[in-house]
Each structure stands twice: as C-alpha cells, then as structure tokens.
C-alpha cells in the first residue's frame, strides 16, 4: 500500500467524490490546503456542498477531468476500467484507494481511532463534540454529520484527529492510532479474514498493540476478550468497568448518567 506525503500542497482528483465517504475526504483535503477536484456520475447534495466550498466537481467520468492532478483517489465502487483511472495510469499518476488516502491524512495529526463492529459513528461523534467543547479543536472524519457542527469532516488546528477505523478492509491497521477505542468485536466482514473469527480477533489485537492507549467497552464480551489479551482502560455499565456509568436517565434527545 502506498501512503502519500500530504505535508506539502498537492493537486488531488477524487473519482466518486459524490459519495458520503469520499466527499468527507475531499472536504478535509481541501481544508488541509490541497487543490481538490473530483467527479461523480450525477449531481447530489455532496457534490453541491463541495462546489460551494470552492472545489471543481464534474458530473460524468472523462479523462479530461484529471486536469493537472498529481494524485488520484478513488472510491471502492470505481473499477479499473474507469476512463479517469485509465488516464491516470497512462500518465503514471498514482491512483489510491480510500484505504490508502486515509492513513496519509491521519499521519498529519495524533490519531484517535474508533473501531468496532457497531457504534463507531456514534462514539466518534460524541468524542468529537466533547473535544470541541473542551476547546481542543479536533479534526475528524466521521461516517455521518455531527448535528451540532453540521458536518462529518473537519480539519482544524488542534493536534488530535478522530477517525473511524474500518475492519472490513483492514484500514484500521494503517491509521497509526495513538489512542485506540474498541466499542465491540463481533464476527462480521469475515470474508476479509478467510471466514475465520480468530483471524478477525488477531487483527484487532494487532490494532490495539500498536496504540499507546487502549480503551475498551466493558459491556461487550468481544471487547473484553481483547482487553484480556492487551490490557487497557475499560468503560461501560458493567461492575468491573474502570469508568462505570450509573444513575442512567434517558430523555427524548439525551441520556444523562453519573
């Protein structure tokens, strides 16, 4: 896997920029100071938002859309026969998958990676809001918009970068997590792991071993199995949690606890 250097300004073209995931990446790359262009098969709210932000986004795929790009990033849905991908290969412009560009972004900050079968977006959103309220000015790429901020992608001046770690394609192993958070571990996306749950658990072990700080949900058996293998801080409602939630009260749009 090629991880490009994004410390200097680049001209980056995104194929499939209208999807939520690639749109978030485009947003962050633009805020980092790179010249970002893109294309998608049709107009949509993400395309419109990127245009409003100042990016040139084409509708339809054509070799001419590459312009003077020196780096091309493509979504998982884009085939090698795509005319823009073929043109980039002919011009020897590096073509990266989403799983290549995310580690390059995370390398520019201290990374907090939220991994797990479920709950990544919710946990990442709560963490982002907590850090914003604490004036830590975090950057983040989250799988959904944070309502209070109006975006799921922010590049700010603080030292921390929050990102969801996807185990479905092993991307979480290359994000350079300084702090690793695991919400739960269940047998999912096993096609990536030869249909072997043990291989999935081994990947999670590799993920947390590389981090300086590990945080696990004490309520999940899979996360606790991981915590026994690689100890860390635990949280949840379970009595054995290091940080335990008690006196839980649920409101219409909120949950409070001690």
What are these regions (language model features)?
Residues 1-56, 68, 72, 88-93, ...:
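ATP-dependent carboxylate-amine ligase
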Residues 9-14, 98-146, 245:
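Walker A (P-loop) phosphate-binding motif
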Residues 35-40, 139-141, 162, 234:
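Short beta-strand "acidic-cap" motif of Rossmann-like dinucleotide-binding folds
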Residues 40-42, 144, 219-220:
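Residues in the short beta-alpha loop(s) of Rossmann-like NAD(P)-binding domains
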Residues 47-51, 58, 64-74, 78-97, ...:
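Acidic, Mg2+-coordinating active-site environments of NTP-dependent enzymes
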Residues 154-157:
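Conserved motor-coupling elements within RecA-like helicase/translocase cores
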Residues 159-168:
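Switch II (G3) loop of P-loop NTPases
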Residues 169-176:
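Switch II of P-loop NTPase G domains
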């Amino acid at each position: 896997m090629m991880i490009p250097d994004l410390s200097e300004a680049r001209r980056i073209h995104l194929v499939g920029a209208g999807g939520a995931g690639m749109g978030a990446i485009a947003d962050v790359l633009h805020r980092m100071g790179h010249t970002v262009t893109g294309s998608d098969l049709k107009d949509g709210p993400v395309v419109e938002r990127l245009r409003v932000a100042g990016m040139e986004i084409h509708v339809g795929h054509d070799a001419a859309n590459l312009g003077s790009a020196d780096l091309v990033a493509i979504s998982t849905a884009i085939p090698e026969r795509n005319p823009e991908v073929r043109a980039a290969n002919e011009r020897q412009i590096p073509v990266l998958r989403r799983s290549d560009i995310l580690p390059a972004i995370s390398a520019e900050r201290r990374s907090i990676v939220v991994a797990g079968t479920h709950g990544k977006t919710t946990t990442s959103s709560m963490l982002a809001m907590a850090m914003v309220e604490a004036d830590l000015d975090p950057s983040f790429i989250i799988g959904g918009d944070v309502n209070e901020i109006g975006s799921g992608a922010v590049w700010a001046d603080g030292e921390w970068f929050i990102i969801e770690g996807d185990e479905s394609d092993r991307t979480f192993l290359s994000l350079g997590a300084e702090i690793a958070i695991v919400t739960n571990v269940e047998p999912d996306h096993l096609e990536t792991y030869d249909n072997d749950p043990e291989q999935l658990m081994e990947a999670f072990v590799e993920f947390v071993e590389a981090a300086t700080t590990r945080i696990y949900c004490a309520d999940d058996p899979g996360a606790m199995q991981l915590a026994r293998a690689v100890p860390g801080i635990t949280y949840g409602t379970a009595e054995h949690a290091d940080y335990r939630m008690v006196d839980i009260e649920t409101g219409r749009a909120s949950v409070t606890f001690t």
